[in-house]
Amino acid sequence: MKGIVLYISLLLLVVGCGRDNDIERTHSCSVAHLWSYVGRSTVIIPDDIYVEGYVVANDKLGELNKCVVVADSSGGVAVNIDADDVESILPLYSRVRVHCSGLWIANNGTKLLLGTKPTGEYLVDRVPSALILNYIHLQPSDNSSQIVNQRTIATLQDKDMLTMVSIDGLSLVEEEHGALWADIDPNTGRTIDTQRHFTDGCDTLVVVVAASCHYAKESIPNKSIRLSGIVDRYAGNSVLRVINHGISTN
């Protein structure tokens, strides 16, 4: 009997240690740390790690498509998702935990991407809608006022990629006065992805507006404005993508 009790005690000890080891193997890291996994090609993340941050961009107002951008204090990462209404699953500005083990990671210039194993021309495939909440968990909210960084055009850096920034004192360049946020294809009558150019008097900022953006047909104010959005990559260049209609007059 004593032998049986001793055996059971040892077995429970081993199981308990195994659970402790599982907990130890799961650890948090920063978005910046994810760059250490990036190689010349898309690779799988083998380690049981997660990042915590805020949803700084999604498909709300049609500004992005099938994508959610999560940022912490060190940077941002885009997760490609096969869902038509990401906002209903991962609301803008919500606090989330992204479990990275098993996801594939790639570098699109200075832009960090997460998704599933690529099967075609894209760097990563989209995470199926049924699996989204397996990888991205909503967390209790706290003060998210610090997710927006104040910048000028001149102070934008590579490390700001996929983070939320706000830039004051911007004016549409004279050549584009009177324009809508997005151009309209004369053949189809539909809006198209458009690049607009703003200046602060010294430097020029390219702002990209998606064809699907809900305010694509609004006129751009011909006055000094503040724009808030994410730093993104478009046509090989760093640009600003306005998020949540982050347009206000100074």
Q: PLM features: residue spans?
A:
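Sec-dependent bacterial lipoprotein signal peptides
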Residues: 1-16
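OB-fold nucleic-acid-binding modules
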Residues: 17-95, 99-250
